[in-house]
Amino acid sequence: MSKKKLPPSSHSPLSYRDAGVDIDAGNQLIQRIKPAANRTTRPGVLTSLGGFGSLFELPIHRYQHPVLVAGTDGVGTKLKLAIQLNRHDSIGIDLVAMCANDIIVQGAEPLFFLDYYATGRLEVDIAAEIIEGIAHGCELAGVALVGGETAEMPGIYQAGDYDLAGFCVGVVEKERLIDGSQVQAGDHLIGIASSGPHANGYSLIRKILERSRYSLNSPLADQTLGDALLTPTRIYVKPLLQLLEVIEIHALAHITGGGLPENLPRVLPPMLSAEIDTSRWPRLPIFDWLQREGNLSEQELYRTFNCGIGMVVCVDQADTEQALEFLKDRGESAWLIGRIVPQTSDGQRVAFNTGNPL
């Protein structure tokens, strides 16, 4: 039985580009970003951008029992402010910071990083600016940008919108893993300064902006409100890796969404709590502005934002001064902000006790 031939279509021919996906633009982007990615290379990188998989040779000879540590994160709705201000050069630093700072918490050295960039329509200049920022963040963290994915998805994202995700892998000697098990009552807590809200709390920030009389161009201290809100997240990897070589760190906490009250308990053993003295570090003007314009309680402020502390280092009392001096010598602002105490009967894991002697 002969097959019936379908009649020819009366429609004009279609291409992938007609559907909103420009393969040529994607290829152009890869060529644009290769020099930036190449600047991040480090021993172990075996491939360049453009392949199916990225290869990294683990320096196995340096370890007795190597443990891989992986992390993934995004930038959240801070992206909306970058898009609104048409400033895309530093949002990639935030992406690397959110991943690499999580990796260092376990004591791991970040090795390589991959990114995922999704948008409704690929604008090569904007995408290149973003990924060059990612590469700069990788340089700050000492991690290699070995690959990524650019997804052009018309109909999923509105015009001008995009999203980012990052993936980071590091390595640590098993016997040197930092898991909080060494934390004990009497340990001191050192806070390392943040540069602002970092990449957390921006849904609340945008809500405050909506009802505020201020614009992103309004002055705030010695910069604009937009500048303060787009200041990239600090990357703590290099100074902390160096600090690990000179003192024993009992725990590290990356202060992200949920602030000190939500992140410190993640690294505390049962039956121990953290006592924090908020008078021991200066609060950046942006946090005072957010509290005033949002009419935020102290509790809401501290459980939403980092409030000036981006990383907490838990050490033995005897190592406090050495750790503080070491961090300050490497350009970090750091303060003794609290201590570890036995958990009280009310079960509170983080207590704010302004003015108490440490």
Swiss-Prot record:
Keyword Glycosyltransferase: no
Catalytic reactions of this protein: 2-formamido-N(1)-(5-O-phospho-beta-D-ribosyl)acetamidine + ATP = 5-amino-1-(5-phospho-beta-D-ribosyl)imidazole + ADP + phosphate + H(+)
Matches recorded under InterPro entries: PurM-like_C_dom, PurM-like_C_sf, PurM-like_N, PurM-like_N_sf, PurM_cligase
GO molecular function annotations of the record: ATP binding; phosphoribosylamine-glycine ligase activity; phosphoribosylformylglycinamidine cyclo-ligase activity
Localization in the cell: Cytoplasm
Pathway(s) this gene product operates in, as recorded in its UniProt entry: Purine metabolism; IMP biosynthesis via de novo pathway; 5-amino-1-(5-phospho-D-ribosyl)imidazole from N(2)-formyl-N(1)-(5-phospho-D-ribosyl)glycinamide: step 2/2
One Pfam family hit: AIRS
Gene Ontology cellular component list: cytosol
Top-level taxon: Bacteria
Keyword Membrane: no
Biological process according to GO: 'de novo' IMP biosynthetic process; adenine biosynthetic process
EC numbers for this chain: 6.3.3.1
UniProt keyword annotations, A-Z: ATP-binding, Cytoplasm, Ligase, Nucleotide-binding, Purine biosynthesis
Protein family: Belongs to the AIR synthase family.
Protein's name in the database: Phosphoribosylformylglycinamidine cyclo-ligase
